[in-house]
Amino acid sequence: MTTTSAFMLSVRLDNVAVVAIDVPGEKVNTLKAEFAAQVRAILKQIRENKALQGVVFISAKADNFIAGADINMIGHCQNAQEAETLARQGQQLMAEIQALPVPVIAAIHGACLGGGLEMALACHRRICTDDVKTVLGLPEVQLGLLPGSGGTQRLPRLVGVSTALDMILTGKQLRARQALKAGLVDDVVPQTILLEAAVELAKKERLAQRTLPVRERILAGPLGRALLFRLVRKKTAQKTQGNYPATERIIDVIETGLAQGSSSGYDAEARAFGELAMTPQSQALRAVFFASTEVKKDPGSDAPPGPLNSVGILGGGLMGGGIAWVTACKGGLPVRIKDINTQGINHALKYSWDLLETKVRRRHIKASERDKQLALISGSTDYRGFSHRDLVIEAVFEDLPLKQQMVAEVEQNCATHTIFASNTSSLPIGDIAANAARPEQVIGLHFFSPVEKMPLVEVIPHASTSAQTIATTVKLAKKQGKTPIVVSDKAGFYVNRILAPYINEAIRMLTEGERVEHIDAALVKFGFPVGPIQLLDEVGIDTGTKIIPVLEAAYGERFSAPANVVASILNDDRKGRKNGRGFYLYGEKGRKSKKQVDPAIYKLIGVQGQSRLSAQQVAERCVMLMLNEAARCFDEKVIRSARDGDIGAVFGIGFPPFLGGPFRYMDALGPGEMVATLQRLAALYGPRYAPCEQLVRMAERREHFWTNGETDQGN
């Protein structure tokens, strides 16, 4: 065997070469620039061995093929030319793999993403396992980039242009059966026979060429291609609002390769990669990626976590059902649900059944896996089965005496080490723990709805919470697949506190006569996934506004909502999507009607509904209040760092990722510009816009939230 660090070459007795990929000291394989020489040395040996019948590339890691290229390489590039050179080096290496004179097979188990899939595309055939960990995709667009090692050229020719555009523009990941159906892989086999199946495929003297589906062949022609690209450009522009330049360049590069040939396509790909790497959008998106990676590694405290073998949940409603699902099906932990009646328990069980059954129908998992995961969830109307639970999460009504009662019951019926975690969105954790016998084991664990989709959780220790309780709760959140940030026990915590003034200002502009659709469109244009009015409808107007009085009582008039407006809307039985009528009209199944905005809303609040502000003015009024409040949270140490503040806003409320989060955005604007803008708005609209002391100090000292050592690279 010849060993060259991350790549190991061995030749079997049947004259098939096996290249095992195993990056030393890393949990996952990532491609680095220094590996090029190692791979070329192996390719040279393969070319010189005339007896070889084929080659198999396979990972020696337990559950991943290649997770992508090392993103730090991009951060080391000083200009577009250096990044372009990096792409061309990758293209050349993939071309050398493709040019090998014998069949080359990629044997894929686990994640095959980014540069990993580009390497697999350079192989002549691909075979993968049917494991749930096996996913294939090109997610570079999520970093403001495009695939730079030939992916934009090879993928359309393999699976067809429409499928390739969909994959590259969205960064979506295909599971094994989806990849087989798309033609991305040639076979799907159990992991136990992956290597042997790949070897047998490599031994075949002639590998049959795959024929594209009729639809893809039509779209590959000049007329079909012209129509497709016109539609894709229009749809993409509507979705990105011009905020993500990578999507436009992806379309251009793929079209160039199909219209002018792969050589021109590779040139266009490398140039676009270099230019995109230097854009502020890519730098911000990479910063979010590195920050989220760091947060996921953060243990929350210096203490070791306590035992975490099973979990209890109080309440089988929407939140309780979602928490049960992520705990059992994502975390693999046994869950016991307690509700006051069997209907609540059945609701929670059905919640998990519906989600798992959808996965079965889509062939993401097998029915046996569904049954195995569902078996982890059980329920009762009393505390039977709770005595050994390591952590209990309450998801009951926002009622302080009720939650205090839950603490007492858990302390009576569970083990002395059991942690009590409250899913409250507004009540102080210290108040919930006020009468606790073991207050050091009481903590907040705030999930966002829908639980199965929203990636963020806030972990909220109160003054007496122990370091071990924090560490154990953070560990649970990570097992649930969540990104946890630890925040202080102050009214609204972090996410809801910065969201409230943003939504309040949108409602205030509504009372000034601005139209609902104009307000929402302005914030979508700015970069939010939905506008503030639609967000309130989605969350539930009653639920979303419940925290306003709490915040107003804690922080004063800057959190007051427009007088009587919210009450008028709620008194008219408008709760949003959940009851079919809010600011928007909804059909029976909760879908928006063609009419969308309910015109009666303007009469209800006593305005005509005629917009006078520009989209930029609307966005500025909402966003500047959010930024100012985020700076206050930083000053008051509600969040531990700018990193946590950025991740909380991006993952919790959809703050535009291409801006990097509120703190990177404020740094980009500059504290002086922030203060000047807020002072201008305060003169126009009142003292709620007065810049906070933190921003004023930073402007005077010319400071930033992110220090010079905290770049867009991983540490």
Swiss-Prot record:
Gene3D superfamilies: 1.10.1040.50, 2-enoyl-CoA Hydratase, Chain A, domain 1, NAD(P)-binding Rossmann-like Domain
Catalyzed reactions: a (3S)-3-hydroxyacyl-CoA = a (2E)-enoyl-CoA + H2O; a 4-saturated-(3S)-3-hydroxyacyl-CoA = a (3E)-enoyl-CoA + H2O; a (3S)-3-hydroxyacyl-CoA + NAD(+) = a 3-oxoacyl-CoA + NADH + H(+); (3S)-3-hydroxybutanoyl-CoA = (3R)-3-hydroxybutanoyl-CoA
Listed Pfam families: 3HCDH, 3HCDH_N, ECH_1
Ranges for region Enoyl-CoA hydratase: 1-190
Chief location category: cytoplasm
Keywords on record: Cytoplasm, Fatty acid metabolism, Isomerase, Lipid degradation, Lipid metabolism, Lyase, Multifunctional enzyme, NAD, Oxidoreductase
Associated pathway: Lipid metabolism; fatty acid beta-oxidation
EC number assigned by the record: 4.2.1.17, 5.1.2.3, 1.1.1.35
Site (Important for catalytic activity): 118, 140
Subcellular location: Cytoplasm
Role this protein plays: Catalyzes the formation of a hydroxyacyl-CoA by addition of water on enoyl-CoA. Also exhibits 3-hydroxyacyl-CoA epimerase and 3-hydroxyacyl-CoA dehydrogenase activities.
Database matches in HAMAP family: FadJ
Name of the molecule in the record: Fatty acid oxidation complex subunit alpha
Organism from which the protein derives: Salmonella typhi
